[in-house]
Amino acid sequence: MLTKRIIPCLDIKNGKVVKGINFVGLKEIGDPVEIAKIYEEQCADEIVFLDITASFEEREIIGELIGRAARELSIPLTVGGGIRSINDFRRILASGADKVSINSAAIENPELIHQAANEFGVQCVVVAIDAKANESGSSFEVYIKGGRENTGIDLVEWAKKCEKLGAGEILLTSMDKDGTKTGYDLKMLNAVCSAVNIPVIASGGCGSISDIIEVFEKTKSDAALFASLFHYGEATVDEVKEELIKNRIPARIIKKEII
C-alpha cells in the first residue's frame, strides 16, 4: 500500500475560512494562511484552498492570498475556485500555487483539462468533482456552481473522461456527506476508484479518525481531505497519522528534533 496523504481543506469565502453543512449554513472560522501554517506544523501532506463562491459569483481568487500562503508554507498548495481559462491557470501557478483545481469550468469546457495538462503538466491539474446520488440511488450525478446546479452527467463517466483528457488527480466530494460528519461515501469512492488509474482524493463526511481509517481500508482512495474534524479542534493531523500507522496504513510523519 502506498503512503496515504492527509489533506486539510480550507473552504474560503471573502478571504476567510468557512465551513457549513451540505454547502449551506456557513460559519466563519479564521485566516486561511494562519490556519494552514498550523496544519503544516502538524504534518499535513498538502493544503487545499477552495474559494467556494468564486465560480458562482464569477469572482476571481485574490492572488495576494495565494502568494502569502506560498511564501509561508513549504508543503504543496492546491488552489481552486473561479478558474475559467488557461490564463487563470497561469496566474494561479505564478502566484505560488503548486496545483490548480477546476470544477465548473471543466464541465463547461473539457478541453481546458487537456490544454492545462499539456502546458503545465498533469501534476498541476486537479479536477474537483461534486456529486450526489440520483433519486433512485442507483448512480451518482455531477453538480457545478458550488453544488447549486445539477448537470445530469454521470459521475463515473465524467471521471473517466477527466483522466483521458489529462487530469493528474480527482478531488471527489460527496454532497450528500459534506459537513455531516457521518463518514465518507464509500460507495461513491469505490465507483470512481475502480474506474480510473489516477489518484482519487476522498472528500465529504469525515467526522472522526475512524472514518479516515475506514476510507483507506475499504476504498482505494489515495488521500483523504477534510475540514470539520480539524477546524473545530476535534483532532490534529499528527493524531490522525499516528492512528493510521497503528492500523498498518502507511503515512508520513516527520518527528521534530527537540533542541
UniProtKB/Swiss-Prot annotation:
Reading the lineage from the top rank, the first entry is Bacteria
Catalysis performed (reactions): 5-[(5-phospho-1-deoxy-D-ribulos-1-ylimino)methylamino]-1-(5-phospho-beta-D-ribosyl)imidazole-4-carboxamide + L-glutamine = D-erythro-1-(imidazol-4-yl)glycerol 3-phosphate + 5-amino-1-(5-phospho-beta-D-ribosyl)imidazole-4-carboxamide + L-glutamate + H(+)
Entries under InterPro entries matching the protein: Aldolase_TIM (IPR013785), His_biosynth (IPR006062), HisF (IPR004651), IGPS_HisA/HisF (IPR050064), RibuloseP-bd_barrel (IPR011060)
Gene Ontology terms describing biological process: L-histidine biosynthetic process
**Active-site residues from the entry:** 11, 130
Q: Which GO terms describe its cellular component?
A: cytoplasm
| Keyword vocabulary terms for this entry | Amino-acid biosynthesis, Cytoplasm, Histidine biosynthesis, Lyase
The Gene Ontology terms for molecular function here are: imidazoleglycerol-phosphate synthase activity; lyase activity
Location(s), subcellular: Cytoplasm
Q: Does the keyword Lyase apply?
A: yes
Q: What does this protein do?
A: IGPS catalyzes the conversion of PRFAR and glutamine to IGP, AICAR and glutamate. The HisF subunit catalyzes the cyclization activity that produces IGP and AICAR from PRFAR using the ammonia provided by the HisH subunit.
Family membership noted in the UniProt record: Belongs to the HisA/HisF family.
Name of protein: Imidazole glycerol phosphate synthase subunit HisF
Organism field: Lactococcus lactis subsp. cremoris (strain SK11)
Q: According to the entry, what is the taxonomic lineage of the organism?
A: Bacteria, Bacillati, Bacillota, Bacilli, Lactobacillales
